[in-house]
Amino acid sequence: MRKLIHIFDKLPSWSASVVVLIVILVLTLDSNPVQIDLPNIVGIDKLVHGIMFGGLAMSICLDIQRRNWSALIGIGSVIVAIVISSVVGVTVEMLQYWIANGRTYETYDIVADVVGAFVLGFMARILLKKYGVE
């Protein structure tokens, strides 16, 4: 697992976050998104939102950690990652509300974005503590 985490070390420190952010923006703002047939499970859309914005929080945590592998990122850095990811989630929902592109605003999407960012942000710290810090 350590080798997998360190494979990104040769890339710029912000690269993982930018890639995840671009994917999220395409999936959430494109008027003709990739058509994925999700199973007809109640709440699957909210789960996907949580995973997307939790993934953004995780990638921000990884990018912060990559600056110094000798010390685990602090709780403050995790909170910053959660806040950034949550702000992006709220912004995306507001853009969906204001831009007539066939997308709709949902308050529960924002809740799912924030919960996903919180859970996976702290999970990133746990995983980095176990596998990443030297």
Map each language-model feature to its residues.
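Bulky hydrophobic segments
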Residues: 1-108, 114-134
